[in-house]
Amino acid sequence: LNAWNGNPKTRGSQRVRPGGEAYLPIPKDLWNKCPFWINPSIDMRDYAGYKQETGQSSYKFNLHFPNGKVYPAIIGQANFKSLETKPQSALGKWIFNSLGVEHPQRERYDEPSDDIITMDRLMRFGLDSVKLWHEDPNDYKNVWIDFAEYGSFERFMKDEMQVQDESEE
């Protein structure tokens, strides 16, 4: 979540990373549980096979945010381990602004910010993950995102019943 607060991208550079730059890590266990969720023709456990077959190192789609904005997104990096938007700051700014971080930007390359997202901060908001879904189960190029209540990911991975927010009923 806090890629924007990392060291400069280029060794020796003094340029701070773009404000709000973020990606969400995707645990390998998720792809083991639901390997074909993103697209039934793609096995997300087989990154090397996907790369060899398509010549691509990421899966591209449109990510729909709760505020109605839509950004190009990818599931990328080795073994499909990250969710990113183009620009990377779109995902980050949505997360940070929702959690009360109004200016996710380092002032200097050699001084990290104190205003980062931690598990404690997420817990104060009752969150620890995001939920993704297809509004149309046959449209694999459009995915919706929103925050998930604390514990949702663990319940999902254990096939336990999800707690539904009263506002969603």
Residue ranges and their predicted role:
Residues 1-137:
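Polyanion-binding interface signature
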Residues 133-169:
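Charge-dense, extended regions
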